[in-house]
Amino acid sequence: MNQSYGRLVSRAAIAATAMASLLLLIKIFAWWYTGSVSILAALVDSLVDIGASLTNLLVVRYSLQPADDNHSFGHGKAESLAALAQSMFISGSALFLFLTGIQHLISPTPMIDPGVGVIVTIVALICTIILVSFQRWVVRRTQSQAVRADMLHYQSDVMMNGAILLALGLSWYGWHRADALFALGIGIYILYSALRMGYEAVQSLLDRALPDEERQEIIDIVTSWPGVSGAHDLRTRQSGPTRFIQIHLEMEDSLPLVQAHMVADQVEQAILRRFPGSDVIIHQDPCSVVPREGKRSMLS
């Protein structure tokens, strides 16, 4: 799984970096030629895109290193750190766009030949939609937090390019403040996306449990297994592509130790079939030593 995961995530990061670099060159020319503050906003965003995508590429390769003596659970948390760093970069670019938009709102400057900006923005929009579609496919296959963060960023780029097209159209008809107003709106939206991305990264670093639906699936697998009378103390978290799952099985007191071990192994394999690549730890408890009032809720 790790080999396929690494290959797909690396390709997504390389594709994002290459696309952002190409669009940066195009936007530099368009901004120099038209003077549009909305295109400047897109240009700054492309700079952030390049830095974020390169960071993703390096971090993903590091996170795929196998566990060692000092990192017994692997290096998957590096992905969450990359997503957190991205959110900081993006917040900085959003602040820059906001301040630039205010400046141009106070002192609007007519654009030179907005048609060039329209063509460039359409090209950027098409390229970004293609990239986001590829990233979405990779996320469905890998559940990579780093690629998901990158995808959220490029999804905001799609919105931004659409807003830029509208702003350029309005400026073409003489409403020059539209360019600055849309730059302000874009800055606010990018900041919102960055804060959401940062929140998800922090939750991962704090070992937030797996989603309720995934935990319920684990419970259903365990409690429906022959030889298992019940279960408690389910603990879950995720680090990079790896889910960590711990649970206590309740078994009849009369069940031989060897048979209890075999049942636990079967349950573990069933969980791994549903969640490949997971790290599963199962503890067997005799029913008589499990006080009902002392068990933690499995979905808490």
From Swiss-Prot:
GO terms for biological process: intracellular zinc ion homeostasis. It catalyses: Zn(2+)(in) + H(+)(out) = Zn(2+)(out) + H(+)(in); Cd(2+)(in) + H(+)(out) = Cd(2+)(out) + H(+)(in); Fe(2+)(in) + H(+)(out) = Fe(2+)(out) + H(+)(in). It is a multi-pass membrane protein. The keyword Oxidoreductase does not apply. Pfam families: Cation_efflux, ZT_dimer. GO terms for cellular component: plasma membrane. GO terms for molecular function: cadmium ion transmembrane transporter activity; ferrous iron transmembrane transporter activity; metal ion binding; zinc efflux antiporter activity. It is found in: Cell inner membrane. The chain crosses the membrane at residues 12-32, 39-59, 82-102, 114-134, 156-176, 178-198. Divalent metal cation transporter which exports Zn(2+), Cd(2+) and possibly Fe(2+). May be involved in zinc and iron detoxification by efflux. This is Cation-efflux pump FieF. It comes from Shigella boydii serotype 18 (strain CDC 3083-94 / BS512). The gene is fieF.
